């Protein structure tokens, strides 16, 4: 391997000038469990055999034994990690999704996708869309996964993600409207963006902090063929047309000590004046940093994030 390092993110990974990546820490795979954790069970399902891609489904234990026709909201979640790190099966995501399902009484699907730089942008968006389409094969109750057939309420579908996963969730909500998923006039009930990874040249110049330059470099690694850099519509969503956002409600979570918070606020401002028909709200945790609720899930502020998340899912959609 070429020893010239282009980007050093020790102790997680190093990127070399020849395009190679060295992942320095073995990634931990948390297995699914049919033994309930916090009253939640989980299992994995393959959504793309040709790409060897799977996802994890979380279900409240009491729903397993439900004999009636009760359906519960469906949450589709995209993990973060700068498009490069973490997986749907990482400890922090298994812990968070288990807690989220316990708090909201929903069925959740956590999507695994191929990551950069081995698979540059836009591969992960296409993988995520494949997962959405696979999930929606269950809307007729004849899909390959019994839990989704029996328990998912497709009139109450939510998209969510943190950091890079929040970016993915946004693009999936745009594509849902553009591709016109069945049934006719279908809309996502709501979208929750935890500390979204949105950039633009203006934001970077305005902040003038090294941490923001780090996120810019990370994007260039994930999307090396982008001629527009951080003006690329994949990452500069604020500079794109938001009127086609295919959901009725949006909750944006921002953290006061997170340099990406400015992008979250800009997204909210643009959404409000875009002509999009929907409602957007913001929850700010002033004294915390990026994805603190994943790193310290037992803190009071993390619990407050989870409560707000649960309340948003339980609100009636207008």
UniProtKB/Swiss-Prot annotation:
Coiled coil: none annotated. InterPro entries: AB_hydrolase_3 (IPR013094), AB_hydrolase_fold (IPR029058), Carboxylest/Gibb_receptor (IPR050466), Lipase_GDXG_put_SER_AS (IPR033140). It is an enzyme of class 3 (hydrolase). Pfam families: Abhydrolase_3 (PF07859). SUPFAM superfamilies: alpha/beta-Hydrolases (SSF53474). It comes from the Eukaryota. Its EC number is 3.1.1.1. A motif (Involved in the stabilization of the negatively charged intermediate by the formation of the oxyanion hole) lies at residues 79-81. It catalyses: a carboxylic ester + H2O = an alcohol + a carboxylate + H(+). One of its GO terms (cellular component) is plasma membrane. Expressed in roots, stems, flowers and siliques. Keywords: Acetylation, Hydrolase, Serine esterase. One of its GO terms (molecular function) is carboxylesterase activity. The modification N-acetylmethionine is found at residue 1. PANTHER family: ARYLACETAMIDE DEACETYLASE, CARBOXYLESTERASE 1-RELATED. Belongs to the 'GDXG' lipolytic enzyme family. Carboxylesterase acting on esters with varying acyl chain length. This is Probable carboxylesterase 1. It comes from Arabidopsis thaliana.
